[in-house]
Amino acid sequence: MSTHIGAKQNEIASTVLLPGDPLRAKFIAENFLEDVICYNDVRGMYGYTGTYKGKRVSVQGTGMGIPSISIYANELIESYGVKNLIRVGTCGSINKDIKVRDIILAMGACTNSGTNRMRFNGMDFAPIASFDLLKKAYDIGKSKGLDIKVGNILSSDLFYNDDKDAIKLWSKYGVLGIEMEASGLYTLGAKYGVNTLAILTVSDSIVTGEETTAKERETTFTKMMEIALELAE
């Protein structure tokens, strides 16, 4: 056991999907995995292990924001030896060409968070995805006939941000969407030498105002889930 994860040793697979919403973790386990065990319910942050097409895979809720995902990622790596950590989450589009329900593979993750500035003594670090996972996910998506978007995203500490000019600036520099976790995950991947990737479904468009419901975000974004599960080794 670790501080926030109640699993015993060997109960967690080497590949773990990381949805922010613990109910999405439950949905993935119940609808995609076989021979499922629930290894964690500490703080209501469910974790499950099962098999997908014969391959062992786990799914662990993380909560929202860089501090929260960093807690779970740290413990999964340090206490349980996880090698592949794949965020499956949502983001808001800030690009007019990125539509609701599009899938984005986050090649890099900018941030306005102070966590990396603290970690690197005021200097900037460029958190990026693992190329192998990124390439495999892209190829899987294309083989399924999906229009996969690949590019930079922003991991923001602010969910409600009134500074529209800042959003326009990020968009001007090619950032595709905004979420709240990937930068922290990618930084820890670099620190520990493990593979990390964020696969994101666009849940709303900051450009057009179109959005999806909470239930849709929990249960209908299955294409990104399937791509992530196919990455299990």
From Swiss-Prot:
Enzyme Commission (EC) number: 2.4.2.1
A Gene Ontology BP annotation from the UniProt entry: purine nucleoside catabolic process
Source organism superkingdom: Bacteria
Record keyword Glycosyltransferase present: yes
GO MF annotations in UniProt: purine-nucleoside phosphorylase activity
Gene3D superfamilies, per database record: Nucleoside phosphorylase domain
Reactions listed under catalytic activity: a purine D-ribonucleoside + phosphate = a purine nucleobase + alpha-D-ribose 1-phosphate; a purine 2'-deoxy-D-ribonucleoside + phosphate = a purine nucleobase + 2-deoxy-alpha-D-ribose 1-phosphate
Pfam families in alphabetical order: PNP_UDP_1
InterPro entries cross-referenced by the UniProt entry: DeoD-type, Nucleoside_phosphorylase_CS, Nucleoside_phosphorylase_d, Nucleoside_phosphorylase_sf
Top EC group: transferase
Site (Important for catalytic activity): 217
CDD domains in the cross-refs: PNP_EcPNPI-like
Keyword terms of this UniProt record: Glycosyltransferase, Transferase
Residues that, per the record, bind a purine D-ribonucleoside: 4, 179-181, 203-204
Record carries keyword Iron-sulfur: no
Amino acids binding phosphate: 20, 24, 43, 87-90
NCBIfam families from the UniProt entry: deoD, PRK05819.1, PRK13374.1
Subunit structure, as described in the record: Homohexamer; trimer of homodimers.
This protein's name: Purine nucleoside phosphorylase DeoD-type
Organism: Clostridium novyi (strain NT)
Phylogenetic classification of the source organism: Bacteria, Bacillati, Bacillota, Clostridia, Eubacteriales
